[in-house]
C-alpha cells in the first residue's frame, strides 16, 4: 500500500522545479548553489508530501465541515463533508461504517453510518441520511447548515471485502440500508475478473422513497452479474415490483438455495432486520449472530 501511494504522486511536479531552481542559481551566481540546493529540496519535499494521499479517519473524534447538501425526497438527503486537504481520503474499508457525533441541546448523541462515497473520492465524503421527527441524530442532520460540523470516528465493522467471499451475494436492504450494499456492489462490478453474482431486494415504503434508483438501475442494466428487485409497502398503480414486506417466499424466489457459496447480507431498520433473521433460518440458512463476523452465512450490517 505504501508503495502504491508513493507511485501515485506525480514526481515530475517535484523534479522539474527543483532542477530549475538549482540550474538557474548556477547560471546567475555559482557560489549560491549550495543554498539553492537546500531551498530547492526543501520546497520539493514539501510539494511531494502535500501531494500524497492521506487517510484521515482515526479512533479519535474529528470534526468535519458540511460543504454541500443534495435533497433526494421529503426526508432523505446526501450530506457532503469536506476533508482537511483536497487529496485526502476518508480511509474507510468497503462495507464498514463510521460513528457520527452531534450535539443536541448540550448533550452528545451518536449513530453509525456507512458513507456513500469511497476512497476513490478525494477531498470529501458523503453520508446518506433519512431524517425522522423523533431521531436525535437524523433530525440534527436535517437542521445542518453549510459550514456546520459533525464529529466522526472510525472505521468500525467486521466486513473486510475481498474477491471470492462468495459465489453469490443475496442482499436485502431497507431504505438507507442501501449504503453498505452499494459500496460492495460497486466494488464487485468494477472488477471484471470477479465472478461474484449479486441479487438485491430493495424495500421501501413508497416509490418516492427509493433513493439512488438511477444508479442502481444503470448498474443492473450494464452488468449481468447484478440483478435488483424492488419491494414497496405502498405501491403506485401499475407497479411491477413486489408489494408488502420482504418475506421467506420472496427470498426463496430470488435467491439461490442456501449453500457454502452463498452469503445473505442484510441492512435496514431494526424490525425488518429481526424479521429477516427469522426468515433466513426458516429457509435453511445458518442462524445469524448478534454481531456478524465475516465468515457468517448471514451477515447483518
Swiss-Prot record:
GO biological process, one term: protein histidyl modification to diphthamide
One GO MF term: oxidoreductase activity, acting on NAD(P)H, heme protein as acceptor
Family: Belongs to the flavoprotein pyridine nucleotide cytochrome reductase family.
CDD domains according to UniProt: cyt_b5_reduct_like
Main location as per UniProt: mitochondrion
Enzyme Commission number: 1.6.2.2
Alphabetic keyword roster: FAD, Flavoprotein, Membrane, Mitochondrion, Mitochondrion outer membrane, NAD, Oxidoreductase, Transferase, Transmembrane, Transmembrane helix
Domain of life: Eukaryota
PROSITE patterns recorded: FAD_FR
Pfam families given in the database record: FAD_binding_6, NAD_binding_1
Species whose genome carries this gene: Schizosaccharomyces pombe (strain 972 / ATCC 24843)
Pathway membership: Protein modification; peptidyl-diphthamide biosynthesis
GO cellular component: mitochondrial outer membrane
Entry annotated with the keyword Oxidoreductase: yes
Membrane topology: Multi-pass membrane protein
Protein name (record): NADH-cytochrome b5 reductase 1
Localization terms from the record: Mitochondrion outer membrane
Subunit structure comment from the entry: Monomer. Component of the 2-(3-amino-3-carboxypropyl)histidine synthase complex composed of dph1, dph2, dph3 and a NADH-dependent reductase, predominantly cbr1.
Catalytic reaction annotation: 2 Fe(III)-[cytochrome b5] + NADH = 2 Fe(II)-[cytochrome b5] + NAD(+) + H(+); 2 Fe(3+)-[Dph3] + NADH = 2 Fe(2+)-[Dph3] + NAD(+) + H(+)
Amino acid at each position: 500500500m505504501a508503495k502504491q501511494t508513493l507511485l501515485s504522486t506525480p514526481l515530475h511536479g517535484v523534479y522539474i522545479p527543483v532542477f530549475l531552481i538549482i540550474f538557474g542559481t548556477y547560471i546567475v551566481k555559482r557560489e549560491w548553489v549550495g543554498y539553492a540546493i537546500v531551498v530547492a529540496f526543501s520546497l520539493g519535499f514539501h510539494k511531494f508530501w502535500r501531494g500524497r494521499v492521506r487517510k484521515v479517519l482515526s479512533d479519535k473524534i474529528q470534526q468535519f465541515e458540511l460543504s454541500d447538501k443534495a435533497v433526494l425526497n421529503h426526508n432523505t438527503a446526501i450530506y457532503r463533508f469536506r476533508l482537511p486537504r483536497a487529496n485526502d481520503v476518508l480511509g474507510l474499508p468497503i462495507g464498514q461504517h463510521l460513528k457520527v457525533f452531534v450535539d443536541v441541546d448540550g448533550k452528545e448523541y451518536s449513530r453509525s453510518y456507512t458513507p456513500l462515497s469511497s476512497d476513490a473520492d478525494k477531498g470529501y465524503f458523503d453520508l446518506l441520511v433519512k431524517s425522522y421527527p423523533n431521531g436525535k441524530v437524523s433530525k440534527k442532520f436535517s437542521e445542518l447548515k453549510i459550514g456546520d460540523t459533525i464529529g466522526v470516528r472510525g472505521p468500525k465493522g467486521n466486513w473486510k471485502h475481498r474477491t471470492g467471499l462468495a459465489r453469490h451475494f443475496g442482499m436485502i436492504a431497507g431504505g438507507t440500508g442501501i449504503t453498505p450494499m452499494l459500496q460492495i456492489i460497486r466494488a464487485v462490478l468494477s472488477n471484471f475478473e470477479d465472478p461474484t453474482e449479486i441479487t438485491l431486494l430493495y424495500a421501501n415504503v413508497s416509490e418516492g422513497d427509493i433513493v439512488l434508483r438511477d444508479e442502481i438501475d444503470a448498474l443492473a442494466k450494464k452488468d449481468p452479474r447484478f440483478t435488483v428487485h424492488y419491494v414497496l409497502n405502498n405501491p403506485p398503480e401499475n407497479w411491477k415490483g413486489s408489494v408488502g414486506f420482504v418475506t421467506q417466499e420472496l427470498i426463496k424466489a430470488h435467491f439461490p438455495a442456501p449453500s457454502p457459496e452463498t452469503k445473505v447480507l442484510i441492512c435496514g431498520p431494526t424490525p425488518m432486520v429481526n424479521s429477516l433473521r427469522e426468515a433466513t433460518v426458516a429457509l435453511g440458512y445458518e442462524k445469524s449472530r448478534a454481531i456478524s463476523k465475516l465468515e457468517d452465512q448471514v451477515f447483518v450490517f
